[in-house]
UniProtKB/Swiss-Prot annotation:
The lineage of its organism: Bacteria, Bacillati, Actinomycetota, Actinomycetes, Mycobacteriales. One of its GO terms (biological process) is SOS response. May be involved in recombinational repair of damaged DNA. This is DNA repair protein RecN. GO terms for cellular component: bacterial nucleoid. Belongs to the RecN family. It comes from Mycobacterium tuberculosis (strain CDC 1551 / Oshkosh). Disulfide bonds: none annotated. NCBIfam families: recN. Keywords: ATP-binding, DNA damage, DNA repair, Nucleotide-binding.
Amino acid sequence: MLTELRIESLGAISVATAEFDRGFTVLTGETGTGKTMVVTGLHLLGGARADATRVRSGADRAVVEGRFTTTDLDDATVAGLQAVLDSSGAERDEDGSVIALRSISRDGPSRAYLGGRGVPAKSLSGFTNELLTLHGQNDQLRLMRPDEQRGALDRFAAAGEAVQRYRKLRDAWLTARRDLVDRRNRARELAQEADRLKFALNEIDTVDPQPGEDVALVADIARLSELDTLREAATTARATLCGTPDADAFDRGAVDSLGRARAALQSSDDAALRGLAEQVGEALTVVVDAVAELGAYLDELPADASALDAKLARQAQLRTLTRKYAADIDGVLRWADEARARLAQLDVSEEGLAALERRTGELAHELGQAAVDLSTIRRKAAKRLAKEVSAELSALAMADAEFTIGVTTGLADHGDPVALALASGELARAGADGVDAVEFGFVAHRGMTVLPLAKSASGGELSRVMLSLEVVLATSRKQAAGTTMVFDEIDAGVGGWAAVQIGRRLARLARTHQVIVVTHLPQVAAYADVHLMVQRTGRDGASGVRRLTSEDRVAELARMLAGLGDSDSGRAHARELLETAQNDELT
């Protein structure tokens, strides 16, 4: 629940702190003192758009700070709130409470804080919206909208799981339909793409390039282009190292010379010379190996230019591929791998199209069944909700009023992109929230024709319809017990006995919820457990919030009773009203 609200420089309020208890709290005050700013502050904590024009004149920023406790909530709600705190890095105070804060700058961006941590406004609202339910005169206007009416019915019916299942199937159905339409429209394009890929892969496979082959060919061609020069160099080097058969005794090559040198050194008894003999022997081994490698090199050299021609022809084949598919052969091979993968994805067979058609049909059937199931839930809940709201209206001095809820199938044209055939044969429009059109109906006196709520209810009647609806939703535990419900002048257009009944109903609601009401009706204010008054505190027009004592309450109620605050008769009337309300057993 909300235990404290601090407002600074918001509208008419300069600095104000209000403390709240369990039960029923009312805020009253003269017109223009800033009562609505209290609710505006709570809306800001709930993530409402920050409006810099709300910052009080002369101030740089406005601040709204709320302190919340969770001790009165059920375990599931507490666990959900704690998850929000943990994900935001927010911390509780030592007493277990949580501080939520919103700061609005006149010139810069607004900021949000939760448990001492800066958070996005969405995170702040994720926490406070679990604790606060705010209702104002604008909500009465929203109640006339079909989507708001459907949302209220779904809350009462606890239809969230059925709605989510429907939405999931609808998303899958729409995706399958898009895929099917795309498949049909692109069948020719896909077939042409497949032909191009097959041709390219066949061309590449025919050439059969190997990784790095184009680079190796460049080196091979360079070598073969200088074949005579290479052969002469290798032959000369080999002859120099091993000699020739017709050489004289002094020019038989390095091998023979090194062999004779080693033998001469080995024949000596001198240790130093014998050590040198080993070094010469090592040199001889190196030279002999070089001679062998030169021989192998000469054997591998082509005898004519045909090898060069073959290499050049192969290079021309590879260049045909690199001109079309990639800059080098390794790139061509990568392109081929990607092309094979793409070709595997391109299912251009009739079987693939038929499979898509079957899948789309299956999803349409499942979606149709989910839509019917959701409609059944809504239709059953609509009867109960209408009955309970009508009963609440009777308790609010509207005994002859009748509230109805119509749930009908929204029909679609054949050209509608979300037309869905139901098992009943109806062609329904599969909207994001189902195929149902939900409409609240109302008539103030039974026997008259029931009309849509937007066309039949006056301002005062609409206030009572909304209160009745919220009471039913709250008492049916669709609004967690222990949470805070805020009503901003929803009793507009109401007076007399109806106002008394509204006060009684709000007081009963406060048995399970914290109820905070901004009102101009003394009959409603008299039923409150705590009475807060918003009043001007200085010549600059600033306002503050004051908690009223018993005598103060009498004076304020007398003022609200047609401005009779200073008269004995006004106080007597106010005292009687207060005593009657406080002694009401609320049965």
